[in-house]
Amino acid sequence: MAEAHQASSLLSSLSSDGAEVELSSPVWQEIYLCALRSWKRHLWRVWNDFLAGVVPATPLSWLFLFSTIQLACLLQLDPSLGLMEKIKELLPDWGGQHHQLQGFLSAAVFASCLWGALIFTLHVALRLLLSHHGWLLEPHGAMSSPTKTWLALVRIFSGRHPRLFSFQRALPRQPVPSAQETVRKYLESVRPVLGDDAFDRATALANDFLRLHAPRLQLYLQLKSWCTSNYVSDWWEEFVYLRSRGSLINSTYYMMDFLYVTPTPLQAARAGNAVHTLLLYRHLLNRQEISPTLLMGMRPLCSAQYERMFNTTRIPGVEKDHLRHLQDSRHVAVFHRGRFFRVGTHSPNGLLSPRALEQQFQDILDDPSPACPLEEHLAALTAAPRSMWAQVRESVKTHAATALEAVEGAAFFVSLDSEPAGLTREDPAASLDAYAHALLAGRGHDRWFDKSFTLIVFSNGKLGLSVEHSWADCPVSGHLWEFTLATECFQLGYATDGHCKGHPDPTLPQPQRLQWDLPEQIQPSISLALRGAKTLSGNIDCHVFPFSHFGKSFIKCCHVSSDSFIQLVLQLAHFRDRGQFCLTYESAMTRLFLEGRTETVRSCTREACQFVRAMDNKETDQHCLALFRVAVDKHQALLKAAMSGQGIDRHLFALYIMSRLLHMQSPFLTQVQSQQWLLSTSQVPVQQTHLIDVHNYPDYVSSGGGFGPAHDHGYGISYIFMGENAITFHISSKKSSTETDSHRLGQHIENALLDVASLFRVGQHFKRQFRGENSDYRYNFLSCKTVDPNTPTSSTNL
């Protein structure tokens, strides 16, 4: 009966890519509407690119310049010094009656040329200003006079209201560091983790590399940097992500909802508001009305990663994947209880309202129809090894091209999960761990991992985001997520009964059920992929805990960098957990440069190891604190060097790829690329949009996100500063490893936080007050901070 109902609804209305079109509607009218939408999008794109390209100037500045030239001509002055007369000679001779028109056109041409020359000069000046990185080396909060002058000039040349891509033409290219300096830094970074003999061998290989291979490789790499936008980012995307043949579960990352608040317990309502907000963000993105991100409020960052946020799918290949990006998509693909649906997001009048989208999602939740044969676990193929999925996809494309296109051509993927998630009072620790695990891997078959991101809506109204990593890094998707949470909760809000605001639309067609007419021959492949996905998912040990005894405000009182503070805490905790030091990966962004992505900060330094050993030997607080400050200064120097394009690993990676392309065998570069990161760390950015006042609404903050470990015997750790007085850690490891335990490391991190804080006079009470307490104290503060999830919130009652 359900299939017959879907068939009848399909006969009554067909869904184009956006508007619902009745069969009786004239075909030429639909062609006209589609063409009109396409031309509107094209014109808007051209206009927005023009506005972004002329920043810091505006079209009004051209009009002012043209008017000034016309006024000068009326006063018998020639501001062009004879150039306008030359332009008149090049114009057609229309007779004496058109002499004024010739003067008008020559003035317009001269004004345009002068305007373009001024804009070009401003862009060159801004690029020179943005190439300066001396401000990074200054102590935080102590800005010198030259830096203040530089900042004032940057603000002047940046214009008043820059658009998202306004700075792309002015951003400098990422520099190629010196090979000698990179090798020196590399040897310095591995000294703490290598024995004497191993270090001597590494030094010998490095010297041979500098003598035999480095000059030629460096020359070719320098040539590449002159010919491309970024000398390493394209190779990083291709060889690290798109050529990786492993499961995407290993490289995705996730983002969580508000930790203490659930705006509505209604799954369909939360999905409606969230999808509407995401599409509002896409609308702003297409019109470039999102403000560019400014580091420390003054230095613009590259916005190139925003371009492939929506309408993007990673298409598997036998040897290499590729990213397919569409200019527009007017539907989302939805998964619920093993079934796929296509939900149109637009009507002829524009974007559907949140209430209309809620109605669509509620129809899906109420649909009792079973999954088609092979449909329920089909998405497990996207979690399979990429070469296997590429081969099976050809068969899927042959037999179910329409359904596959509906999923891959969607704006993004939505998963309506049948289970609740989020923090619970009954078992807060286990509930957070399960929440993280559900976002990272799901059940192996309920996420389409190829999509740029998947919006996950749980049965109790909790949200989450699962992000494919190749198209962008965490700060970019984090900006999207902050906007989504703030807008859907504070600006859109919910009615008192928990539904989206507005009224249902009885004329709205039902969602389109996708039909997968798949051959039985792919059943073994689906079963194999499902077993592999469940094995990978079941092997991930996730642990999330909020640390509430102190946060960023306390660390500020200690006059140290909050990120460096946490990195040294992690070194101390990991040493207590494993009894040894290891290569540590901390992600730093290189978006100060055009198309920059990330660089590695090797946080396990000689100075950090000296501090950790002093703490382990229980030396005096004064001595440990002195070593701590030295280690913090070293970490800050490494971080700033990485951000300014003087890091280690991306340069060595590019040299390695160049050596492979030139068929050169370098034992040194091979050894470097075979190194294992047993500790992979990252700080989750927060308050990029400034849409939520965390001081007045401290509960309305995301608890961040996390990722899987980079090694079978390693840890993946992310951390986020929640407001001023709490830190949330996300720890992951493999259950199959006998050397790691996420919960054990979490306890070491808590103890290390208290121990390091007690070194400072303002934090000495921490060690006395909390040492030896049961770890359940982490969640004791929830009783006074958790908001009842059954109480809907909206912008009005906030």
Swiss-Prot record:
Disruption phenotype: Knockout mice show decreased food intake but higher susceptibility to obesity and diabetes when fed a high fat diet. Mutant mice show extensive learning and memory deficits, they exhibit impaired motor and instrumental learning as well as detrimental hippocampus-dependent spatial and habituation memory. Pfam families: Carn_acyltransf, CPT_N. Residues 76-103 are lumenal. PROSITE patterns: ACYLTRANSF_C_1, ACYLTRANSF_C_2. Residues 759-798 are annotated as: Required for interaction with GRIA1. The active site is at H469 (proton acceptor). It is an enzyme of class 3 (hydrolase). Changing M589S: Loss of binding to malonyl-CoA. Loss of regulation of SACM1L phosphatidylinositol-3-phosphatase activity. No effect on interaction with GRIA1. This is Palmitoyl thioesterase CPT1C. It comes from Mus musculus (Mouse). The gene is Cpt1c.
